[in-house]
Amino acid sequence: MARFFRRRKFCRFTAEGVKEIDYKDLATLKDYITETGKIVPSRITGTKAKYQRQLSRAVKRARYLALLPYCDRH
């Protein structure tokens, strides 16, 4: 039987030494949102819990300020 090597997930924010996730950094936020507009869970992305909380807060702020859409285009 073939065994699949699963790539080890790592937190991009820890590796880059990011202190705070900014809601105005749309390029970073779009990497963690699905095409339907949902926030991707940390078990998929490998983001640590501390940064996942900051990420979700930043996405919600950006949505409130209309920088990001709440859902996909219909």
From Swiss-Prot:
Part of the 30S ribosomal subunit. Forms a tight heterodimer with protein bS6. It comes from the Bacteria. Belongs to the bacterial ribosomal protein bS18 family. Binds as a heterodimer with protein bS6 to the central domain of the 16S rRNA, where it helps stabilize the platform of the 30S subunit. One of its GO terms (cellular component) is cytosolic small ribosomal subunit. The keyword Ribosomal protein applies. It comes from Nitrosococcus oceani (strain ATCC 19707 / BCRC 17464 / JCM 30415 / NCIMB 11848 / C-107). Signal peptide: none annotated. GO terms for molecular function: small ribosomal subunit rRNA binding; structural constituent of ribosome. Keywords: Ribonucleoprotein, Ribosomal protein, RNA-binding, rRNA-binding. This is Small ribosomal subunit protein bS18. GO terms for biological process: translation.
